[in-house]
Regions:
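Active-site metal-binding motif and surrounding structural segment of the metallo-beta-lactamase
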Residues: 127-174, 190
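Sec-dependent signal peptide recognition
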Residues: 5-13
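Divalent metal-coordination and catalytic microenvironments
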Residues: 105, 115, 152, 159, ...
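Metallo-beta-lactamase
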Residues: 20-123, 127-128, 133-141, 175-208
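Short glycine-/acidic-enriched loop or helix-start segments at secondary-structure transitions
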Residues: 123-124, 159-161, 184-185
Length: 208
């Protein structure tokens, strides 16, 4: 017979080995761009930002004054024409630029909006860069959307003012990891956080 104390030691040893193996397997399963502290890094081979680059608000203002902002002729389309075109092509596939990174994309029966920003400026409060042109439509004028795509959480892409007032709460939302909470707390329920390289089937005709 095996001594009771020895048996307990053997069992503890085996459990310890199993636990270590589980931890190693868990770590190995994590993608390269996931760091242990829950943050992320760029894929291998990505350009590395120089540590010498520092943000200076004074330099930013100085360089900004050098930029000549001019708009091409007919760059801004009259809102009446925008509405007429959306109505005219409502049964067709189309891409309509609303402003900056905000696009309306219609594919079959699915209407998609990307990075919806309808606020006057990009920032947490009244501060932040102002728009150079107004969006082609107001938020309450866009057609019903079925899918909202958020690329990242910079202020000029994730606009909390727009998210709070977004009229179509049943829209399916796809966001990067850890950003779904901003939509859920504003009563948008169908929120899906996605990692790099992941795919999701939106409906029978569309996979993202």
């Amino acid at each position: 017979m095996v001594d009771g104390k020895k048996l307990i030691k053997i069992l503890c040893f085996l459990i310890g080995i199993t636990s270590c193996n589980s931890i190693v397997l868990t770590m190995e399963k994590k993608p390269y761009h996931h760091l242990p502290d829950g943050t992320f890094r760029n894929p291998e081979g990505s350009p590395v930002r120089s540590s010498d680059i520092k943000f200076s608000y004074r330099t930013f203002i100085k360089e900004k004054k050098k930029i000549d902002i001019t708009f091409p002729k007919d760059h801004v389309i009259d809102k009446k024409i925008v509405k007429e075109n959306l109505e005219k092509f409502k049964n067709d596939d189309y891409i309509a630029w609303i402003g900056h990174a905000t696009f309306l994309i219609k594919l079959g029966e699915t209407t998609i909006i990307t990075d919806p920003v309808f606020s006057k400026n990009a920032g947490p409060l009244i501060f932040g860069p102002d728009r150079f042109t107004k969006p082609a439509l107001n938020l309450d004028e866009i057609p019903k959307t079925h899918l909202l795509l958020l690329t990242h959480n910079h202020y000029d892409h994730q606009d909390m003012g727009t998210i709070r007032k977004y009229p179509f709460k049943n829209t399916k939302v796809l966001t990067p990891l850890n950003l779904g909470k901003y939509f859920k707390k504003n009563k948008i329920k169908d929120v899906n956080e996605m990692d790099w390289y992941e795919e999701i089937k939106v409906n029978e005709d569309l996979k993202v």
